[in-house]
Regions:
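Chalcogenol-based redox active-site neighborhoods
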Residues: 1-163
Length: 163
């Protein structure tokens, strides 16, 4: 069994900076593969609401734009950020565009898929699949694209410190 945790990984921000996930150790992290031209794109609004509600208590939310499903994220990193900010008021961090399946799968998604394999396998089926990583960096819960951000608020709440 691997001793690797989510917090041993890193990603590249949409501004080109390397972001070590170790800086978020001990905090819950919600990871979402996103797209700007998808039927689920309006979930950006709900994700931003989760970010605004829970960030001050420790939730980290990261969007990972992906163009692997129906070519629904064709823009550049700058265009994606502008679209998210202007249309949905997104303030949570975004990565550079990544792959979530196949030989080019980003290490974050390789880890998450392995930790939260479903009865249907580990492949991500569509945009806006969500992964909630517990503060231990090992426990991961996976949510289908059809699960709205509001529907996972209680699971997030359960991982946050209570005043």
């Amino acid at each position: 069994m691997s001793t690797e945790t989510f917090f041993a990984l890193s990603y590249t921000s949409n501004h080109g900076e390397q972001v070590p996930l170790a800086q978020f150790a001990g905090q819950p992290v919600l990871v979402v593969n996103t797209a700007s031209k998808c039927g689920f794109t309006p979930q950006y609004e709900g994700l931003e609401q989760l970010h605004e509600t829970f960030a001050s208590r420790g939730l980290v939310l990261i969007g990972f734009p992906c163009d692997q499903f129906g070519h629904q994220e064709p823009g550049s990193d700058t265009e994606i950020e502008e679209f998210c900010r202007l249309n949905f008021g997104v303030t949570f961090p975004l990565s550079t565009k990544v792959e979530v399946n196949g030989s080019g799968t980003h290490p974050v998604f390789s880890f998450l898929r392995k930790q939260a394999e479903t009865s249907l396998g580990s492949l991500i089926k569509w945009n806006f699949t969500k992964f909630l990583v517990a503060p231990d960096g090992r426990t991961v819960k996976r949510y289908a694209p059809t699960v709205t951000p509001a529907e996972i608020a209680d699971d997030i709440e359960a991982l946050l410190p209570h005043p």
